[in-house]
A protein has these predicted regions:
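Phosphate-interacting basic helix/loop segments used at nucleotide- and nucleic-acid interfaces
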Residues: 2-14
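Exposed alpha-helical structural elements
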Residues: 6-9, 30-33, 108
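A generic structural signal for short, solvent-exposed coil/turn residues
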Residues: 16-18, 48
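Short, surface-exposed beta-edge/turn micro-motifs
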Residues: 19-23
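Detector for the mature cores of small, proteolytically processed
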Residues: 34-123
Length: 123
């Protein structure tokens, strides 16, 4: 199964369980596949201007060392659950954020989770 198909299959599974796609991380190779898939005749004729504007399921795709997706959903007590899921294998990291937790603190935790996933992906 190609990587974009893996992304779609994983996304379908998470949506079934009430998760919302929040962020998309793609390797250069996967971004290129997405670019080819979404290109129109007009955009094929243009000079490549990077990955600005590339979207997967209406979510901006960011270049990364990982092929992964961030999912989120509401949880009890006003909390919010976030999960980072690798696209190609059944590996995910989960974090529950309190309602009053600062966005800066949440972002720090998400960066740490991405670093852990990169380590897993390399090993």
């Amino acid at each position: 199964m190609d990587c974009l198909s893996q992304f779609r299959a994983t996304l379908d599974n998470y949506r079934t369980h009430g998760w919302q796609l929040a962020r998309v991380l793609m390797t250069t190779k996967t971004l290129e596949a997405l670019r080819r898939e979404t290109a129109t005749d007009e955009t094929r004729a243009k000079v490549d201007d990077g990955d600005a504007g590339l979207k997967f399921e209406n979510v901006a795709a960011r270049e990364s060392e990982l092929d992964a997706m961030w999912f989120r959903r509401a949880s009890s007590g006003g909390r919010e659950a976030w999960e980072l899921r690798l696209a190609a294998e059944p590996y995910a990291l989960f974090e529950m954020f309190e309602a009053d937790e600062a966005e800066e603190d949440r972002e720090d935790v998400r960066r740490e989770m991405e670093a852990r996933a990169r380590m897993k992906n390399e090993g």
